[in-house]
Structure formats: C-alpha cells, structure tokens
C-alpha cells in the first residue's frame, strides 16, 4: 500500500503523499478489511431444505392437521409438496396450461378448507386468459388422497373478475376463524387507480372480500357483510386498498393483518376490519394527495408504514405465535420484496427492525403448525426464522475519522493511501456533487468482467462524499468484506463539516430547507445488485477518460491505474458520453438511462415490473422500450408506451 500510494502521488498528483500527511500513523486504520458493525438483528434467516430450490414460488403453507409437509405454490401454475425434513418434491397440481402468466399474474394463492381432512377441498386464485388483459379467478379443487394430489379436473369456478390492467391483482386467499373465505383484489392496476375502483362499492377491485363457500352455489354471502343488504357488491368486506398482496389471520386473536403495496410514497401494514375504508386512492400512508378535499373521517390509518424509496412491495407475514423466539412473541412480521428488512409491529407501537436480510426477493412467509415462521424467496430459497447470533467484535467506527477512509488533517478529503477517480457521467443525486476514491489492499488488483464491470478484491472499500454548495452532507462507504460480500454504510456530516457519524438506520433530514435521504444499510444493495456488478460506477466505459497529470497535462485514467498495479492490463471499451459532450443527443440520452436506470432495468435486475434493458451496450431495438406497452400501469394516458419515438408526452420513460 505504501509503494502504491507513493506512485499515485507521482502519477496523478494526489495532494498528500503517504507518510507526509500531518498526524500520519502507520498503525492507524487504513480503510482496509473493515469490520461489519455489530449486528442489530434479533432474527436471522437460516436456509433450510437446500435441495428444494424451485423458482417462482409465491406461497408456502401446510394443510390442516398435517405438520409433516409443506406445499409450495409457484407463479407459473404448479403446486409442489415435500416433507418438512426434505426429500423429493412432488407435483400435486399443475395449472400451467390454464394460467395467464405475467409480471404480477399467474397462480397467486392457495388455501385449504378448514375441514380439508374430511372434505378434501382446496381453493386457489389465479389469472386466466380472457377479458381486456386477463381475468382473476377463484376456484375450488378437490383431493381424494389426503393432499398427495389435487385433481385438476375437479375445478369449480367460484368467482371471476376481469382485470383492466396487468398489475395489482392481489391474489392471496385464506380462511378466517369464522370459517369464511377471504380474498384480496388489487385496484385493477395502472397508476393512481384511474378508474376509481378502490372507493367504488359497485366493483370488487381494490377490496378485501369475504364469501361463504359452504352455504351456497357456488357461494353464499355472510349476513354481516357490509353490503349484504345492498348499496354495493355483497362480497365486499373492506375497501380502499391498492394491492393487498399478502394477508393473514392471527391464530390467537383472529385479527386480520394485510400488507397494502404502495405507489410512490408509502408501503402500508393494516389491520383489516369489517366495513372499514383504508383510504386508497386519495390517501397513501399518512399522506393525502389533495389535502383540501381529503376527508379522513371514516378512514382507518395503517398500523405501520414506511417510505418506498428503495422498497416497492410490502410482504405481509404472520403474527408470531411460536415458542422458539420469545423476543418477538405477538409481533406481526413483515418485509419488503426489494429491500429485505424484516420488521415486527404490534398495534399502538412503533415497528422494530428485527433483521436485515438483504435484497433476497422475499415473496412471502409460511406459518408452520407449531407457529414457527419460514420465509420464501422467489429464487427458491426457504428460510427458518431463528434467533440471531450475539454480536462479535468492535465493529465499524462510529466516527468517519476513525475508519482510515479520510485524511486526518482534512476529513473531507482522501487519505494518502487512497486512489481518487472520476467518472464520465454522474448519477443524478438531487443536484449534489460528489468526490470519490477507493482503497484496495496492496498487492491485489481489480478484475474486469466481460461486460466491463470492475470487481474489487475482498478487503477493499469505495468512498463517496456528497456535497451541496460545497457543504458535505453524507459519506457512503461501500465495503467488500473479507468474506467477499458487499455492504453499504452511511456517515452523516455535522453542520460545520468537521466530522461525520455512522447512522444505524436510514432517515430523512431537512438540510438548508431541502430534504436529504440517508439510505438504510439494506437500501444500498437494491441498486448495487449482483446483476449490476455491485460497484456501479466502476466500469470501463465510465472510467475511460483523461485526468490532470502532475505536470498539468491530461493523463489517461486507465493508464494511470495500470501503472499503479490496480489493473493488470488496460481494458478496452467505448467511453460513456458525458452530458455536456459533443456526442450525438441520442447517445447522451442512452448514457443517462444507463447510469440512472440500468442498475435495475437489466437482465436479472431487481425490478421485474418492466421488461427493459437500459444498458448503454444494449442496442435500442433490443432494449424492450420502443413502442412497448407498459406492464405496470400507464399513468392514465391513452395508448401510452414506455418510449414512443417522437412523442415524449406519451412516453412513460420521459414522464
């Protein structure tokens, strides 16, 4: 590291030479091999049943009176069964030829009749071809062998509802303690509920419904349903919901908990009560869209809500009633598909963070017969919620100056052993400017993937400080720990710019009259995903540029990094055009989308709501945007497209 820093001073004229920095201490922290902070987690996810890795799972459940087997419901239309201790997975129901499969469509839910052991009845929800887009369907099936198989020919369709758009289909269903079947419908999709469905009692869209599957043909209406005597659809139990993807009943109290997926502001956790209104489409979380016309008189506020800055889909779980985790007894457990933080909450109390599971793509929770909880991810992983191990080690320093990642004399600047770098095109960050540097263990080098993403060795750190009007706001450390895993940490600067303090959780502060969002640790890996190469800005096309040399003459940045030994060979690529360059406007626009959007919108990226590939290297004809109809809402625009050439007013990317 000493030799590399001295060479750096000669090559790129870093102001501080190693050993000349005031207060330099060779034994001081060097921003290398940084430790993780002591875990704040109460829970950990323990992978179980590793041989059961069936992708596309959306629900995990057990049949009544059978604690020995799990049933896994998959979005493509297949239900599998396997033992709680492992063994081969068996297909018990295959509806793959019947379902209409899309981003939020397919086989979405399943529930066993409470008397399944005697009547063999199973209920499923799925989207079927038909209608403008497709039709949501609730059907009854039967098993004659105790659940080893479910007869596809026994289907009895109970209810169908045409969907006007492809998203917000809800899909969960469950039997309540009253013996009735409950089902959640989204508002019909698009954005902002353009048809006003959630508040319209004459449609089932945007509602939680309740029906009696034992008392009629094909069902009866419970006498105490809110509109059983008229005034709306008699199936309605509660209204004002956007997309209740998952809900569950507390096995001890019978309370009905639901997660309502938000739009642009808030994700909600609600206690659903008969006849109550939950506010969508004029209120989301604590916020009314039009304060002057927002009548909150009869609304039920959410029990919990959180900003969907780097989150996008609340995943409701269950109230924990097991015995292995007394610390979370009675808490309702929930997470987010994109973020992975696991929270717990009780009515009247603030939510608590129980675990940071990372961006695993958790889609649901399964409750075992003994009350223990399991989490399911979309890639096929099944996890048992266990007590977290006690924290070990001193952890990351609370003060940025103690990390070795900044200069002792000037904590806003890089230390002598760091390597500053610059990019062709900055990510937009609310108008903030940035300074960047990296620290790589001496003797190690950076590898370059075939697509140009750079991979730093374990023990490295990336440092980025955000400024507004030359005032430091935040420094982020993106660390590759010694086990090879990446993690992000945020330090918030004091008003005088003298020191920055480690934040334990995300928060929003108003600075000089403007909000600034400090990300939670779980937020970082939403954009800094494996699909995007983790480091984002460190890619050949971004770093292929000139920098000032020690003599004031321009110097090729990649050549300098090769001479430092950080790169074993000079990679080749076309530089990403800067916004103020003389490159063609189309190229500059594609570069903007690459930097600001492609970390999610790419193959295997975290956003599955739009099938776009916005990487600069992808030909526009293959990007999936030109004249493509939106899959997740059209913002109320007639004949909108993701990108309509020559018509920005109907191009959702522009809007």
Each PLM stretch: what is its role?
Residues 18-192, 246-262, 310-350, 371-372, ...:
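Acidic, Gly/Ser/Thr-rich repeat motifs that build Ca2+-stabilized beta-propeller blades
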Residues 20-39, 389-435:
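N-terminal pre-domain segments of enzymes
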Residues 135, 198, 202-205, 266, ...:
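A detector of repeated loop/turn-to-beta-strand junctions in beta-rich toroidal repeat architectures
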Residues 277-311, 572-573, 619-637:
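Flexible internal linker/loop segments at domain or repeat junctions
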Residues 90-103, 154-165, 215-237, 282-309:
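Surface-exposed loop and turn segments in beta-propeller and other repeat-based domains
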Residues 137-146, 201-213:
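Beta-propeller blade signature
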Residues 351, 359-361, 391, 400-401, ...:
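Sequence context surrounding c-type heme c attachment/ligation sites in exported
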Residues 5-15:
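Bacterial N-terminal signal peptides
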